[in-house]
Each structure stands twice: as C-alpha cells, then as structure tokens.
Amino acid sequence: MKLLAPSILAGDWWCIGEQIQATIRGGADILHYDVMDGHFVPNITAGYEILSHIRKRASLPIDAHLMIENPDKYIPKFVEAGANWISVHIENNYHIHRTLQLIKELGAKAGVVVNPGTSLSAIEEALYYADYVLLMSVNPGFSGQKFIERSIERLRILKEMRDRINPSCLIEIDGGIKENNIAEVVRAGADVVVVGSGIFGAKDIEAQTRKLKSLMLSAVSV
C-alpha cells in the first residue's frame, strides 16, 4: 500500500476547495493538514475550525500533523472537527504512550513524528503503539523547503526498526518531496508520501497528482 497525501498548507487558500478536489480527481489518498502554533515551530497556521470546513468538502481521510505545545489538550477538538489521523511530535511529548492511546480511544489513527535532528532511537518504544510514524525530511515550520538527503538513510533504518517491532505501522515522510525523489523515498521504505509545493505549485494540480501517484506505484513494481 502506497498512499499519496497532498499537504494543503502549500495550496492557495482563496481556492483551496477547488484545489483539493483536483487532487482527489488525480488519485490522492489522504489530505495532510499541518497545524502550527508559533511556539513549537516558528509559524502559525489554521486550527480545528478550518479543518471542520475542509471536512465538509472532502471525502478523503484527513491527517492532522500537530506541531503544537500541549497537544493532548487539543486532540479531541481535531477529532471532533473531522481528523481521521493525528500525529504528535516525540520532541515535545514526555508521555507519548498516553497521547497515542488518547488518539486511538477517540477513534483516529495515532502517529508519532520525528524531526531530522532527532535520533530514531527516541521513537523506538513508541513504535510498539503507533499506527504510523511521520519522518520529517525538512525542519518543520515552513512549506517549500529543500529535502534533507540524509533522510533516505533514515528511512531505511526506520523501516528496519518498524519491520522488527511493529510491521503493521505505516511509515510516512514529509518535506521537500518532488518528482525527482518521490520514487527514491518509496523504495527506501515510505508507505505514505506527503507532497506540498510539488503538487500545489503545478499549473495543473490534477495532472501533477496523477503523475506523482504513478511514480510511486512504478517504484514499487521495480
């Protein structure tokens, strides 16, 4: 199973509904929704109220990536707003097992996120409980950053850890994914690939989504 997740943070919010529909027609599997509070990361984005409006206009699962302080306080709000997947960072969560359990109890898939500068050993225990791991291939906070090449090796290491500890756990990657590297990250072990400007920066979003999904599937068959 290889899933493509357009990151709507990179879209044009004047016409985001139309752009989301274009990604759906192009074969997108999940919508990735970044949430930033200006404290954990140096940027501020939309919260659960905007997510609830997107939920009304999109049939795909919504993956809410919470880059915020005190995520446990807001997780119920995001689930209520329509998030189907919710991920939290290991870097600001001292009770990751409790947080993952909370997400699951609310009926959503529970994910743990690891930043580029954090050792993968930090999430080893969380792998036993997580439905997915989100590996950041840029430093979180802004769309359109350059892919960190070391992420390919980290993907391979993470896949080995996942296969040993919890084979059903999905591996997601986010940051700097374009046409030139999407096949490589899939071959290295990514099950879910988040793409922002690599989709929404195209003139024809539907065609670009379809092209990237084809590249992912071709990488699996090689």
From Swiss-Prot:
GO terms for biological process: carbohydrate metabolic process; pentose catabolic process; pentose-phosphate shunt, non-oxidative branch. Its EC number is 5.1.3.1. The keyword Metal-binding applies. SUPFAM superfamilies: Ribulose-phoshate binding barrel (SSF51366). The keyword Metal-binding applies. Substrate binds at residues 7, 65, 141-144, 174-176, 196-197. Coiled coil: none annotated. It catalyses: D-ribulose 5-phosphate = D-xylulose 5-phosphate. The active site is at 34 (proton acceptor), 174 (proton donor). Gene3D superfamilies: Aldolase class I (3.20.20.70). Catalyzes the reversible epimerization of D-ribulose 5-phosphate to D-xylulose 5-phosphate. Belongs to the ribulose-phosphate 3-epimerase family. This is Ribulose-phosphate 3-epimerase. It comes from Aquifex aeolicus (strain VF5). The lineage of its organism: Bacteria, Pseudomonadati, Aquificota, Aquificia, Aquificales.
